[in-house]
């Protein structure tokens, strides 16, 4: 099964009423730290590029529901450190880096959906789009 179409759907879901897209890149990883979407070899793809170490660290925090590592060391995605803003219900994590944009990470039963909002975009639209995909996966017991 190709999960890359879910990234395209997530990006489309982030559009506001004027048609502006508030998500430029996204990916889905498993709670076991595996890549579900294709990890691109360049930055030209809509898919976020995470290293195996970044995926493992993110998965570990969500699986254990312990976000202390994010609080103390930040959230690393594509080699960039994002400041941890908050977590909600051990399922949703928000991060931000000035000049880079913001991150929304939301887990389902077996997956973590990660979206990136470019600087100047509306993270609220990103949160909604990530939530739609994560909740859909949850409804499939995934």
From Swiss-Prot:
Family per record: Belongs to the profilin family.
Species name: Strongylocentrotus purpuratus (Purple sea urchin)
An example molecular function term from Gene Ontology annotations: actin monomer binding
UniProt record, GO biological process: regulation of cellular component organization
Source taxon at top rank: Eukaryota
Pfam families: Profilin
Major subcellular site: cytoplasm
Functional description taken from the UniProt entry: Binds to actin and affects the structure of the cytoskeleton. At high concentrations, profilin prevents the polymerization of actin, whereas it enhances it at low concentrations. By binding to PIP2, it inhibits the formation of IP3 and DG.
Record-level GO cellular component terms: cell cortex; cytoskeleton
Tissues expressing this chain: Expressed specifically in coelomocytes in response to injury.
Record's protein name: Profilin
Compartments it resides in: Cytoplasm, Cytoskeleton
Quaternary structure and partners: Occurs in many kinds of cells as a complex with monomeric actin in a 1:1 ratio.
Protein keywords: Actin-binding, Cytoplasm, Cytoskeleton
